[in-house]
Swiss-Prot record:
Alphabetized Gene3D superfamilies for the sequence: 3.30.70.260, P-loop containing nucleotide triphosphate hydrolases
CDD domains found in the cross-reference section: ABC_MetN_methionine_transporter
Known role: Part of the ABC transporter complex MetNIQ involved in methionine import. Responsible for energy coupling to the transport system.
Binding positions (ATP): G38, H39, S40, G41, A42, G43, K44, S45
Organism: Pseudomonas aeruginosa (strain ATCC 15692 / DSM 22644 / CIP 104116 / JCM 14847 / LMG 12228 / 1C / PRS 101 / PAO1)
SMART domains, per the entry: AAA, NIL
GO MF term list: ABC-type D-methionine transporter activity; ATP binding; ATP hydrolysis activity
Family: Belongs to the ABC transporter superfamily. Methionine importer (TC 3.A.1.24) family.
InterPro entries named in the record: AAA+_ATPase, ABC_transporter-like_ATP-bd, ABC_transporter-like_CS, ACT-like_dom_sf, MetN_ABC, MetN_ABC_transporter-like, NIL_domain, P-loop_NTPase
Protein name listed in UniProt: Methionine import ATP-binding protein MetN 2
Membrane topology: Peripheral membrane protein
PANTHER family found in the cross-reference section: AMINO ACID IMPORT ATP-BINDING PROTEIN, METHIONINE IMPORT ATP-BINDING PROTEIN METN
Catalytic activity line of the entry: L-methionine(out) + ATP + H2O = L-methionine(in) + ADP + phosphate + H(+); D-methionine(out) + ATP + H2O = D-methionine(in) + ADP + phosphate + H(+)
Length: 335
């Protein structure tokens, strides 16, 4: 578990104090993929780098697996960082070293490994990230996705229990992003690693994360299960991220329905309810007619969900609303 107890960070610039992270309390459970999302300057990179003390906190306590990281001396911090891997937006590979040598670097710096042990570990990691045929290549000979896979392999070299991902997919095209996210999900599942990633894309959170914290102005403004936050956003910042991910402007969508008669609802289905023939049943039993104005079915990690915007007219509208609410469907009245 990673715990933040009133952790905050302030920079001093030209005699002025600039807060980067407001006092923050946060719990990240072991084995989760935890996402931090926010626009530039929201404080997410600062928070991530506080975990392994690449940034020093101005106050508060950080506990990782029960150990007070803020109290570690230089030697204790060095040993602790061997348990925390990190991957970066721009890969940070050594251009003069081969793929194999880049992956081996943390093992050689840590010491205590024979050449045979290093070579065996590098071969194992190359196979895990799908680059067994690229050991003798140099970074300049690789695609962006391949470079990031090398970065992931290097981060795993010392068998960490935590993996920090600093905008690991923002420099990649959509197809490569999907493959890297799939690799991270496999690593989390098979190695039981705790992964903390930061991003400015809600789609990245939706694909792989279990929990999410939304950041704005150096503070966590919303936090919870990804499905709950994605499907029922409360804070304006979260709502903007969700509607950007859906490529829908909320105000324009409401304007599109101005001419539509009846009660306009947005229904959100989750899990098995996504595929249930609910609307037909409600219409038959209550005598209402409905028009589907928009709809989509997608997945949040492994959970299917559906969203429908529809207009109800005629019949017993109150009974229809009651049946929808009773069916474990989230109902939002738009008009």
């Amino acid at each position: 578990m990673i715990e933040f107890h009133d952790v905050h960070k302030t920079y001093r610039v030209a005699g002025r104090e600039i807060p980067a992270l407001q006092p923050t309390r946060l719990n990240i459970q072991a084995g989760q993929i935890f996402g931090l999302i926010g626009h530039s300057g929201a404080g997410k990179s600062t928070l991530l780098r506080l975990i392994n003390r690449l940034e020093e906190p101005s106050g508060g306590r950080i506990l990782v697996e029960g150990e007070d990281v803020t109290a570690l001396d230089a030697e204790g911090l060095r040993r602790f960082r061997q348990r925390v891997g990190m991957i970066f937006q721009h890969f940070n590979l050594l251009s003069s070293k081969t793929v194999a040598d880049n992956i081996a670097m943390p093992l050689r710096l840590a010491g205590g490994f024979s050449r045979a042990e290093v070579d065996a570990r590098v071969s194992e990691l190359l196979a895990r990230v799908g680059l067994s045929d690229h050991a003798r290549k140099y970074p300049a000979q690789l695609s962006g996705g391949q470079k990031q896979r090398v970065g992931i392999a290097r981060a795993l070299a010392c068998r960490p229990s935590i993996l920090l991902c600093d905008e690991a997919t923002s420099a990649l095209d959509p197809q490569t992003t999907a493959s890297v996210l799939q690799l991270l999900a496999e690593i989390n599942r098979e190695l039981k690693l705790t992964i903390v990633l930061i991003t400015h894309e809600m789609d990245v959170i939706r694909r792989v994360c279990d929990q999410v914290a939304v950041m704005d102005g150096g503070a966590i403004v919303e936090q919870g299960d990804v499905a709950d936050v994605f499907l029922h956003p409360q804070h304006p910042t979260t709502r903007r991220f969700v509607f950007e991910a859906e490529r829908v402007d909320e105000d324009e969508r409401h304007d599109d329905f101005a001419h539509v008669p009846g009660l306009i609802l947005r229904l959100t289905f989750r899990g098995e309810a996504t595929y249930a023939p609910l609307l037909g049943t409600v219409a038959r039993q209550t005598g209402v007619d409905y028009s589907i104005l928009s709809g989509r079915i997608d997945r949040i990690k492994d959970t299917p969900y559906g969203q429908l915007t529809l207009a109800l007219v005629g019949g017993d509208l109150e009974a229809a609303m009651s049946q929808l609410n009773a069916a474990d469907v989230h109902v939002e009245v738009l008009r």
